[in-house]
A protein has these predicted regions:
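C-terminal cap of metal-dependent C-N hydrolases
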Residues: 19-27, 358, 378-412
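Divalent metal-coordination and catalytic microenvironments
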Residues: 8, 38, 43, 68, ...
Length: 412
């Protein structure tokens, strides 16, 4: 089917194809044309232009009137924990009362709280709850999403989570990437026996995940009070044996070796980075691993923001993601994430847009097909209400601006 989108005030995030990520100064370029049209065939972008340069084609099956709105590529959210068993607002109050993330975890809250609740829920209940959140983020402009396990912390429950993620991928129009995060914390029954738990992850969980083809990637929480660089290396090596490349939660709580171990294993991304050092930034220059910042986490936990401005100035690419989860970021609103990146990390709007689209896609190994408006890419985009400029999107940080959303050329 041929779909024409016309009457576009600004068509933003365009490229001619072949752009897989943007680094350093390139991130300040978020190309756009005005008074434009775009043609989609069978869910794939085929061409676009300005009406002044070339009239829109007429031999189409359907026309969508953008009504003077801006068309943007859908957000690519490369770090979420959207499958979970319930909210944790009691811990929200604990944080207000001064308890730290680590103190809440030691009291049996945090990740272990979510694991206990998930154990009691059926796969169907988990799926139904997660799909509500998936529909929510689609409506807010997200078109590709990474979803992690990590609230199971035993083999059966980790597999249950990953089967839910697979079902979301099979039944939802959003593009889903699945990541196994059995090493999110030490399961409660392994308290005081972290080495035995790592053995379980390596010898039982990863082979079981691979046998069912349930995950694209393997992630580890490599940070102070969680898993050591040595344990992380062992888990990532086990994943690679089954074709699952690594991703890392690192440098969130302290400079604890996460960046170094990510680079050692050529991890696809290293995420959080609130405690990233100048030495870490220097180590990452010229490497393939995508630094990924999670500004919503810093906002919600009232902790320092990752030094993204330094990273970009050093020539690095940067992605930003929501970290949607019940404990530290109960929101998947990528528009707000973009606003936070501008306000708190001092990114220019264009830099934040690139971090949330093409670089987010790269952090999921999806940028060949997603993350920009380009011929040959999947037609994932949203149409805004008429706005004065694309800078209005992060400026009006709570204003609903999305009018219509499309995934693979189909309106949602």
């Amino acid at each position: 089917m041929k779909l024409l989108v016309n009457n576009i005030a600004t068509l933003a995030g365009i490229d001619g194809g072949g752009v897989l990520k943007k680094c350093g100064k390139e991130m300040a370029q978020f190309d756009a044309i005005n008074d434009a049209w775009m043609l989609v065939e069978d869910g794939i972008i085929t061409e676009f232009d300005t009406t002044a340069n070339r009239p829109a084609p007429t031999n189409v099956d359907k026309t969508v009137d953008a009504a003077g709105g801006t068309v943007m590529p859908s957000w690519c959210d490369s770090h979420t924990h959207i499958v979970y068993a319930g909210s944790r607002e009691r811990e929200f109050v604990d944080k207000i009362n001064g308890l730290s993330y680590a103190e809440i975890a030691k009291r049996g809250g945090g990740i272990l709280n979510s694991a206990d609740r998930l154990h009691e829920m059926s796969e169907q209940q988990l799926f139904d709850a997660a799909m509500e959140r998936v529909h929510e983020v689609i409506a807010k402009g997200t078109g590709a999403i990474e979803i992690k396990s990590g609230y199971g912390l035993n083999t059966a429950d980790e597999l249950k989570m990953l089967r839910v993620i697979r079902r979301i991928s099979e039944t939802s129009p959003i593009k889903v990437v699945s990541t196994f995060l059995g090493a999110h914390a030490v399961g409660r029954e392994y308290a005081g026996r972290q080495g035995d738990y790592v053995d379980l992850v390596v010898n039982e969980m990863i082979p079981a995940v691979a046998a069912e083809g349930l995950a694209n990637f393997v992630d580890v929480f490599c940070d102070e009070g969680f898993f050591t660089p040595e344990e992380t290396s062992r888990i990532l090596e086990a994943g690679l044996k089954y074709g699952m490349r690594g991703k890392i939660h690192g440098q969130e709580l302290a400079p604890s070796g996460g960046v170094e171990v990510a680079l050692k294993h050529n991890a696809l991304s290293v995420d959080h980075l609130e405690s990233m050092t100048d030495e870490d930034i220097a180590m990452m220059c010229g490497r393939d691993t995508m630094p990924t910042a999670l500004p919503g986490t810093s906002f919600f936990l009232n902790m320092p923001f990752a030094p993204v401005r330094k990273m970009i100035n050093a020539g690095l690419p940067v992605a930003i993601a929501s970290d949607y989860n019940p404990g530290s970021t109960p929101s998947g609103d990528m528009k707000f994430v973009v606003s936070l990146a501008c306000i708190k990390m001092r990114l220019q709007p264009a830099e934040a847009f690139n971090a949330a689209t093409i670089n987010g896609a790269a952090a999921m190994s999806l940028s060949t097909d997603y993350g920009s408006i380009a011929p040959g890419k999947v037609a994932n985009f949203f149409i805004t209400k008429p706005i004065s400029s694309i800078d209005f999107i992060p400026y009006a940080y709570t204003t609903p601006i999305i009018n219509r959303t499309f995934l693979a050329g189909m309106e949602q």
